Amino acid sequence: MTVTIALPSKGRMKDEASAIFERAGMKIAAVGSDRSYRGRVEGWDDVEIAYLSASEIAREIGSGAVDFGVTGEDLVREGLADADARVDFAARLGFGHADVVVAVPEIWYDVDTMADLGDVAADFRARHGRRLAIATKYWRLTQQFFSGSHGIQLYRIVESLGATEGAPASGSADIIVDITSTGSTLKANHLKILSDGVILRSEACLVRARKATHEGNPVIDRIVAAVRAVL
């Protein structure tokens, strides 16, 4: 059985993932040209590398098309309804840190918690004749957090296709759920994160698809052990 590991195809995520695998004794070499989307691991004949976008990696792990992937936890949990049943977060890799957060306009002085926001949402229709609008690319995580964790039902999600942080200023939404590393972009757009509004503290992870063929497979166990040993 050949084990396929999906890695980010470009950028810092690709470089940092490759560095971790090299420290783990799994040096990656390109197959073909530098622009090839395939790779191999030197000395591991039963392992191949596939280079994909971060969102593609989350989808391919969920479908079982690849065995491992390095991608953000936020993308996996947003893309898969039952993430923990379908994948195993085998290792947290210590880079790509970012938080998925609830942010509201700074001028909402009396709104500092999700409970405060729940009160606003309940009152919003009476005051404005519509539901509270939330701009986000994370509709699944938003629904789970608002409805599941905090019992807030009176809202609607506006799909964000561009810069989510600009939605309140443009009038397309009232608040946002977005990912942030430093919070500086939110502050620049006069938004504040609620005190209990961190939905997920995400980072890059080595994620394994839960497949029956992995049970008792020494290559699977060896990969996980090698990566964990260098973290």
UniProtKB/Swiss-Prot annotation:
Compartmental location: Cytoplasm
Catalytic EC class: transferase
Gene3D superfamilies linked to this entry: Periplasmic binding protein-like II
Keyword Amino-acid biosynthesis: yes
Highest taxon listed in the record's lineage: Bacteria
The reaction(s) this protein catalyses: 1-(5-phospho-beta-D-ribosyl)-ATP + diphosphate = 5-phospho-alpha-D-ribose 1-diphosphate + ATP
Membrane-spanning residues: none
Pathway membership: Amino-acid biosynthesis; L-histidine biosynthesis; L-histidine from 5-phospho-alpha-D-ribose 1-diphosphate: step 1/9
One Gene Ontology term, aspect cellular component: cytoplasm
UniProt note: domains: Lacks the C-terminal regulatory region which is replaced by HisZ.
Cited HAMAP family: HisG_Short
Name of the protein in question: ATP phosphoribosyltransferase
Gene: hisG
